Amino acid sequence: MSTLRILAASIAIASLAACQRQKLAPADEHTAHMAPGDVAPPAVAQSNQQGDPSLPPSARSTAARLADTPRHAEWVKVAWEPGSKDSIMAWIVYPKTSNAKTPVVVVVHEIFGLSPWIRGVADQVAAEGFIAIAPDLVSKLRGGPSMDTLSADSARKLTTSLPIADRNLGIAAIAKYAMSQPSAAPRYAVIGYCWGGTTTWMHTINGGTNGYSGGVAFYGTPQTAQGALRDSLAKIKMPIMLLSGSKDARIGAAMPGIDSAMKALNKWYFGKNYEGAIHGFLRAQDDPRAPRQTANVNETQADVDAERAANLAATKDGWPRTVEFLKKNLGVK
């Protein structure tokens, strides 16, 4: 057996050991490895502070950031494909006026659906000079386009039942719509979080649609059949980056094999696993929370403070890397 196939098998075994696979249980692969407080986004008291303007908002600062943004944003409905009666609801944000045509960035939501926080990320992407569009990829499954935010439980059930092929179709439709806008350039990238990170990988493996220029996956790995990882990664033609936190055990176990396989395949890839950061570090950042006290968890305030610091450090390194990646691969100076 080749070294690459051994690596692929090792990754598959690690993933199976850390998470239940969908065909064995209804639970999705993204919840089994999360910290207890991240399985559903905890109720966060909103702050009137907007946070660091050079970073996306945290969960706590999202409302203030969205309320005070100087950028134009609106809800749009996009057909899944030409002639389709089904539409995708999406939130599109435009950068402040520019004389140049602007590339597009598709922002793919977590398993929690198109939340206010994802809209906040899209706003920050637009602040960096791109047209940002965040689709609600479960629009069809929820009964049609809606501006209402789903509950975390409802969103999780819908996202985990959406096939990869439909995700790719939805992203392609959204990208084509955004690139058709008068101010848009015919190039796009994808960034995604958790479930959206996996979706970003699969869109990259699938090849995207005309104009696809690369993807950034935050704490998400490829979803492939056991033993098929190497063949899937071999299909990649565009740059991709993976950013995760060391407390995300499943992705941490998979990353060394992905790194080695992508290097051996001579693909443009960068991966970083931030020490002490959690799954969902970009949403959490340094938002305050109480120590968790359960039968299996006995946190101290010092533990919480260390985690908050690690999450913020990961965000301060990971977001500039993301912006640099987008500008380089979308041809923005």
PLM regions: where:
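Serine-hydrolase catalytic machinery in alpha/beta-hydrolase-like enzymes
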Residues: 22-49, 55-66, 75-179, 183, ...
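Short alpha-helix in the alpha/beta-hydrolase fold that links the catalytic acid
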Residues: 121, 228-229, 252-262
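Short beta-strand/loop motif that positions the catalytic acidic residue
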Residues: 236, 242-244
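Primarily recognizes the serine-hydrolase "nucleophile elbow" in alpha/beta-hydrolase
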Residues: 171-235
